[in-house]
């Protein structure tokens, strides 16, 4: 008999939630061990998608995160069918969480996208919160970290969502003019208008292993060119090989790499070598 989470629990009388299964390879392990490994499968290395709150928890120094602009809410200004209901049903205000934090003592402004809110899509609130985060960084002379996880621009907001591409990119240009760094972390997936704007504009572009990164998805490209793409196409390792990503970093090592980068950007007295 094939072992599943259900029959393991039935046989041993184990309460629900004790076991979990990798979505990629079906490997079964204890939920506690899975969480301690930062939701990465120890067998195949698959990086399970994380909520913005969970990612902040293991990325920044404990107790250092101070959220900003959490009260901003999306509005269905186009009266798009079903959009208002989706907003009301969600427990989140929108697809990004922003705030000030410290990473190994270095002060930063951080924005983390959450794929659980409408596929991490970028609408007016996402664009506004990211721009406000950058403006806060400019005011306080802090470097910026954005962790992306998004399917692209939010269709329910039409051209207003597309406008956020230029809006966020312009804000990052101001950051660069003031000699402040932007570190971009690309997670699975980072696609569409987010990939075509701020996500790929980092002074350092870091990606998690096997993350899907690109504008159009592989299925759309295959249907357009009528050719089958390789499995590695648009994955982070492929982009690193072709110069679009600076470094692919395992989730457990993200803090160490960010510390090295921040040491370089704040002190300017060392060579940056990963």
UniProtKB/Swiss-Prot annotation:
Pathway: Lipid metabolism; malonyl-CoA biosynthesis; malonyl-CoA from acetyl-CoA: step 1/1
Cofactor(s) the protein needs: Zn(2+)
Residues binding Zn(2+), per UniProt: 22, 25, 41, 44
Zinc finger (C4-type): 22-44
CoA carboxyltransferase N-terminal domain residues: 18-274
GO molecular function: acetyl-CoA carboxylase activity; ATP binding; carboxyl- or carbamoyltransferase activity; zinc ion binding
Domain of life according to the entry: Bacteria
Enzyme Commission number(s) of this protein: 2.1.3.15
Gene Ontology cellular component list: acetyl-CoA carboxylase complex
Alphabetic keyword roster: ATP-binding, Cytoplasm, Fatty acid biosynthesis, Fatty acid metabolism, Lipid biosynthesis, Lipid metabolism, Metal-binding, Nucleotide-binding, Transferase, Zinc, Zinc-finger
Family assignment from sequence similarity: Belongs to the AccD/PCCB family.
The protein, known as: Acetyl-coenzyme A carboxylase carboxyl transferase subunit beta
Gene of this entry: accD
């Amino acid at each position: 008999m094939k072992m599943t989470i259900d029959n393991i629990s039935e046989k041993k009388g184990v309460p629900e939630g004790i076991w979990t299964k990798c979505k990629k390879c079906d490997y079964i392990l204890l939920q506690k061990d899975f969480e301690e490994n930062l939701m990465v499968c120890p067998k195949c290395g698959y990086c399970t998608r994380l909520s913005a709150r969970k990612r902040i928890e293991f990325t920044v120094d404990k107790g250092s995160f101070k959220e900003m602009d959490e009260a901003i809410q999306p509005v269905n200004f186009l009266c798009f069918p079903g959009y208002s209901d989706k907003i009301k049903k969600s427990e989140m205000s929108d697809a990004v969480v922003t705030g000030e934090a410290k990473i190994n003592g270095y002060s930063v402004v951080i924005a983390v996208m959450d794929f659980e809110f409408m596929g991490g899509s970028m609408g007016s609130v996402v664009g506004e919160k990211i721009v406000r985060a950058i403006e806060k960084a400019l005011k306080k002379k802090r470097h910026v970290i954005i962790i992306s996880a998004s399917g692209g621009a939010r269709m329910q907001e039409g051209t207003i969502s597309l406008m956020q591409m230029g809006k966020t990119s312009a804000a990052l240009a101001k950051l660069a003019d003031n000699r402040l760094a932007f570190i971009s972390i690309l997670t699975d997936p980072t696609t569409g208008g987010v990939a075509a704007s701020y996500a790929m504009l980092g002074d350092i572009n870091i990606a998690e292993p096997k993350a899907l990164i690109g504008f159009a998805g592989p299925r759309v490209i295959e249907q357009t060119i009528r050719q089958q793409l390789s499995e590695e196409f648009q994955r982070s390792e492929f982009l690193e090989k072709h110069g679009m990503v600076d470094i692919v970093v395992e989730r457990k090592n993200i803090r160490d790499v960010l510390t090295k980068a921040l040491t370089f950007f704040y002190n300017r007295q060392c060579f940056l070598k990963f």
